[in-house]
Amino acid sequence: MWLRCLALALTLLMVSGIENNTKDVCVGNPGIPGTPGSHGLPGRDGRDGVKGDPGPPGPLGPPGGMPGHPGPNGMTGAPGVAGERGEKGEPGERGPPGLPASLDEELQTTLHDLRHQILQTMGVLSLHESLLVVGRKVFSSNAQSINFNDIQELCAGAGGQIAAPMSPEENEAVASIVKKYNTYAYLGLVESPDSGDFQYMDGAPVNYTNWYPGEPRGRGKEQCVEMYTDGQWNNKNCLQYRLAICEF
């Protein structure tokens, strides 16, 4: 026992560098632990830790209350592609008969006003002698001098045809236009390629003539008819420039 104490003392002396005043130190065995002390006071709260990651979503909750009211209508969408045409339906029932035209007051009023306007227009144009009314015919000229074929196209484009007098009254009306412009005019008659006689443009035979004495002559060469300023007729080739007079 004393040897152990001596070794410890020498070691302590060498470490501390102290040569004298050494003390004998002896370490004993650990004693029996004492009884635990009473619990101390609670410590203070620590600092807040770092925010953790979000947790997983919770389970689906139960349905809510009653559905809300429908929202307002949205904007109209673009029209879709047209579908195929359906089958033709059955004819509908026949409607009740309408009133006779003579009893339709509105129609009669419209016709009366239209007739009045037409007569007014004709009257105004007649003052300029560019339009003359004889019976159910209307003769008109635009003062142009062109060949026979061009006159045909001009009159047809206006809805009429080359003037062709069929009575002394009609011939006098056409002659008054010829006198006004002081130039000859072609009439709506042509020589038949078969008989050589003159006929109307639709092929019907002529029922009225006012030939200049000794006319017509030059069969086969002069296949059109012109009117002099005195209203008499003469056959002529169709390539001359003559006053265009149309009838409607």
Swiss-Prot record:
The lineage of its organism: Eukaryota, Metazoa, Chordata, Craniata, Vertebrata. Glycans are attached at residues 20, 207. Residues 29-103 are annotated as: Disordered. Oligomeric complex of 6 set of homotrimers. It comes from Canis lupus familiaris. Disulfide bonds join 155-246, 224-238. Residues 1-17 form the signal peptide. PROSITE patterns: C_TYPE_LECTIN_1, C_TYPE_LECTIN_2. One of its GO terms (cellular component) is collagen trimer. Ca(2+) binds at residues 215, 217, 234. Belongs to the SFTPA family. Residues 42-51, 84-93 have a biased composition (Basic and acidic residues). Residues 28-100 form the Collagen-like domain. It is found in: Secreted; Secreted, Extracellular space, Extracellular matrix; Secreted, Extracellular space, Surface film. Pfam families: Lectin_C. GO terms for biological process: respiratory gaseous exchange by respiratory system. The modification 4-hydroxyproline is found at residues 30, 33, 36, 42, 54, 57, 63, 67, 70. The gene is SFTPA1. It comes from the Eukaryota. Pulmonary surfactant consists of 90% lipid and 10% protein. There are 4 surfactant-associated proteins: 2 collagenous, carbohydrate-binding glycoproteins (SP-A and SP-D) and 2 small hydrophobic proteins (SP-B and SP-C). Keywords: Calcium, Collagen, Disulfide bond, Extracellular matrix, Gaseous exchange, Glycoprotein, Hydroxylation, Lectin, Metal-binding, Repeat, Secreted, Signal, Surface film. This is Pulmonary surfactant-associated protein A.
